[in-house]
Each structure stands twice: as C-alpha cells, then as structure tokens.
Amino acid sequence: LTNPLTVDAVVLVGGKGTRLRPLTLSAPKPMLPTAGLPFLNHLLSRIAAAGIEHVILSTSYQAAVFEAEFGDGSKLGLQIDYVTEERPLGTGGGIANVAGHLRHDTAMVFNGDVLSGADLRQMLEFHTEQRSDVTLHLVRVGDPRAFGCVTTDDDGRVTAFVEKTQDPPTDQINAGTYIFGRDIIERIPTGREVSVEREVFPNLLADAGVKVCGYVDATYWRDMGTPEDFVRGSADLVRGIAPSPALRGHRGEQWVHDG
C-alpha cells in the first residue's frame, strides 16, 4: 500500500471564477465562505485526514490571499508550499508548473473548486494495486448529459474521453481529482497553457506504454461553478450530506467551528 506521507497533494486554485462574479471580485473562488469556512478549508482538511502532509497550492489569481489565510499549513497539520503562475497556464500547465516542488514520486492533484466525498486513501490504494501511471476519480451521476464522460473497461482502464452528448455512453464523469506518477507530470509541456482534460489525458491515452485507470465511485460530488452551487454545497456541508473533517462533529442546523 502507498503510505500517504510519500504522496504530494497539488491543489489547482488558479482560476478567476468568472461564473461567480461579482462574488469573486473580492476573493478567489476557493476562498469564498462555505459553511462558515473558506471553501478550500474543506478540501485541505480532507487531504490532512487522508494522511497526506505536503501540499502545493498552484495559484495565479490573488495568490497572496491564500498564503495570508493558510500560512505554512501547520494549523491544519500540513506543510503548504505556494507556487504562483505568472500567467494562466490552464489545468495541465498548472500541474507542470509545480514539478520542481514535488518531494515524492506520486502526486494527488485536486481541482480546487470541487466539493467531493471521495475516499482519498481508497483511491490511492486502487492506484497502487492497479500499478497505474495515472488514475482519475470518476463519479457516477444521475444525468451525465451536462458533462463530458469517461468510459472504462472491465479492468478499470480508461478507454475514451467523450465530449458532452445527449446520448452519453456511460454515467461516469471526470470528478477533478487525479493521481499522477511524477514521471508523467514531468512530460507535460511547460511555459504555455495546457489543458489536462483536452490535451494531457487524450495524449496519455494514445500512448500504449502509459496505464490510465479510472477509480469509480458514487460519493458526494459538486462542481462549485455557480452561486447556486455555493448555497447548496454550504447547506450539504452543514447537514452532513457532504463530508468535511473541518466541521468536526458540528452537524445539524446549529454548529460552530474552531475560530
């Protein structure tokens, strides 16, 4: 099994959050209050609870706000490094940009605006057992038509990335959490904008020497794209429908958290 202490977490928080304007003019999307805490708090607490210690925040927009809030990470039991993009590099470029700051051979990469209940330890175990080069978290959704789908075979290997369609071949969608071998990250082009979804993954899939697997579950998942998502996500966190170790035991309508 993979010891989580030998895994880096990379959180992509570079986006401007234009769908959330005017909310995001004052703060980057991952810093918006969600159930009384900055949204990113919930993800960082899940990373810490999984036993991962070293976190790299890949930022571009209002980067100083993150460091002012989380500092070196010690309050959360983490060691946080900050890597700032001089210009937006996209999801793939944001991963490639942190390569020099990785401490380990395995990196768990998180899209910073997803609220998820996936079991990170289980996903790591799956990645190790499969001897996978890249593992994507795939979540089953009731109506996949709003999303691009990802098909897998009986062995868990990813077979195709399918654009949005009215007739999806599967209910599995890319849930925005990935595990990469460091060697794969080092192959991503640097210094330019790269999309992990549109460029990196299709290229890896076309390479017979690379094993790309899908870790499939049906846990809580929400892409926090719109103001409505923040309202619903906050309510789900407060009610315990969306799990967050940051809200230790304080469930129901009345709750408090450590200031």
Where in the sequence are the language-model features?
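Residues that recognize and position ribonucleotide moieties
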Residues: L32, M108, T177-Y178, V194, ...
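Short, high-confidence coil segments that cap the C-terminus of an alpha-helix
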Residues: I52, H104, R131-S132, G209-V210
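Conserved core of the sugar-phosphate nucleotidyltransferase
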Residues: A68, G117-R192
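Conserved N-terminal catalytic core of the sugar/cofactor nucleotidyltransferase
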Residues: L1-V11, R19, L25, P33, ...
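Short loop/edge segments at beta-strand edges and connector loops
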Residues: T59, T84, N111, L136-L138, ...
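A conserved catalytic-core signature of glycosyltransferases
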Residues: G93, F110, I173-A175, F180, ...
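Left-handed beta-helix
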Residues: L1-T6, V114, Q122, E129-Q130, ...
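A structural signal for short hydrophobic beta-strand segments in well-ordered beta-sheet cores
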Residues: M31, V150-T152, F201, G214
